[in-house]
């Protein structure tokens, strides 16, 4: 009789311990899910900011291209004025050849590799029988399975986000290099054009 009582007490203790572990495990999966959802939100915000930054860089590069176009017109006008005034020196050819590097490497385009939009798809990670080994086989373990499935899907999305961010950052770094080259080229051409114009006005 005493042995039966001891066994019942031991079984009750085991059941209580199993319930405690189930509660702790459930809370753990809830925290995991909350953390990966916060990471996903941060990733989405980062992608949006990168996209906005890409648009700003595109506008800046378009401005550099427009300045280049305007400078071609200004240099042509200075050439015509130089011929009219009898000035033979024509550094425009030299300027154009020196600027060719800056203006000849835009083949990849500003938005050549925009990041692919992240699709909220869950990667199929479920194993037959679920993610956990059943002990209590109740609603808590069902929720644990669901939480872990969502965690797995979000982690898959985070991986895609990281790849998209890396691609976009690489694209923007190349674009920033182009913008710097074009800005240097434009500044040089503007300075030289100003010197020529000043010389013409002084000689007149």
From Swiss-Prot:
A cellular component term, taken from the record's GO annotations: neuron projection
Tissue: Expressed in several regions throughout the adult brain, including the mesencephalon.
Coiled coil: none
Protein origin, superkingdom: Eukaryota
Gene Ontology BP terms: exocytosis; locomotory behavior; mitotic cytokinesis; synaptic vesicle fusion to presynaptic active zone membrane; synaptic vesicle priming
Annotated t-SNARE coiled-coil homology domain residues: 19-81, 138-200
Transmembrane parts of this sequence: none
GO molecular function, one term: voltage-gated potassium channel activity
Keywords: Cell membrane, Coiled coil, Membrane, Repeat, Synapse, Synaptosome
PROSITE patterns documented for this protein: T_SNARE (PS50192)
Protein family according to the UniProt entry: Belongs to the SNAP-25 family.
Name the UniProt record assigns to this protein: Synaptosomal-associated protein 25-A
